[in-house]
Design a protein with these regions (language model features):
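Short alpha-helix boundary/capping and kink motifs at helix termini
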Residues: 1-84
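Solvent-exposed functional surfaces
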Residues: 71-265
């Protein structure tokens, strides 16, 4: 795979040329951040950064804020420039403005896909607790983990994201990312049941199963001034979906103190 890295003095005219190659799927420029960088450059506080400008297959995929600031100031500055044909480099770049995973997965419903993939990866790694997330130096969820998972499961995630977007538009009782993540978690056992469970959460129907009980809890929570935290709610959803698959009801929907986060084994 071709790579070339060197230090270049970038002039305003070269910066404009590079900015003209930015792909359509790239993030929009954040004017406030550009002004901040421009102010640093104008007062001479700008130094050579280890965060390289990245040109991938002729397009600028990293550095548009810095180059926009350079153009605004109208002066030349040195940059490390990486030229590559490796599209995988886009998934691990780490710029001054935090890149969201949705920027990496530039597809329809990318925001839902990326956030659902993150939730599934965290769930599979055992990083979710009823009270939030848990982290350690060994078991963590990285951007690369999320991108890899999303790319391997893109077709299924895209279908789920499109479905949950339509359902959410009718009755927004459950976040689209949680709904898509539920389908993703349940589909290996029974995709049809997973889709039906999530659909029932939004649209209702029936009064004698776990989907009905969970929908009532979601409606009650959405109307409450004291809402359950998202991790706790996701745990209830997992527990409820497991009961739905088994043809049982969960009874009182809660996670007791000391209880481990629900699984879908």
């Amino acid at each position: 795979m071709y790579h070339n890295i060197k230090i270049e003095n970038i002039s305003p005219s070269v910066a404009k040329e590079l900015l003209s190659t930015v792909p359509d799927y790239q993030r929009k420029i954040k004017a406030g951040y550009v002004l901040k960088l421009a102010a640093e450059m104008a007062k001479g506080a700008w130094r050579l950064s280890p965060d390289a400008l990245v040109k991938m297959n002729g397009a600028l995929v990293n550095g548009q804020h810095r180059l926009s600031a350079l153009v605004r100031v109208g002066r030349q500055f040195p940059f490390i420039v990486l030229t590559t044909k490796d599209e995988g480099i886009y998934g691990i770049t780490d710029q001054g403005v935090k890149r969201t995973i949705a920027d990496i997965i530039h597809v329809p419903h990318g925001g839902i896909i990326s956030s659902a993939a993150k939730l599934v990866v965290e769930y599979k790694k055992g990083l979710i607790t009823p009270h939030g997330r848990t982290w350690n130096s060994v078991n963590i969820c990285t951007n690369s983990d999320i991108v890899d998972y999303a790319n391997k499961n893109m077709e299924e995630l895209s279908e789920s994201a499109a479905l949950t977007s339509r359902l959410y538009g009718k009755t927004p009782v459950l976040s689209k990312r949680m709904a898509a993540a539920l389908i993703e978690i349940g589909r290996n056992k029974n995709k049809q049941k997973a889709v039906l469970f999530v659909t029932r959460l939004y649209e209702g129907g029936g009064e004698n199963d776990a989907a009905y009980d969970m929908r009532e809890r979601l409606i009650k929570n959405s109307a409450s001034n004291s809402k359950l935290n998202q991790s706790y709610m996701f745990g209830l959803l997992i527990k409820s979906m497991k009961s739905y698959f088994n043809g049982t009801r969960t009874g009182v929907l809660k996670i007791t103190d000391g209880e481990k986060f629900p699984t879908f084994d």
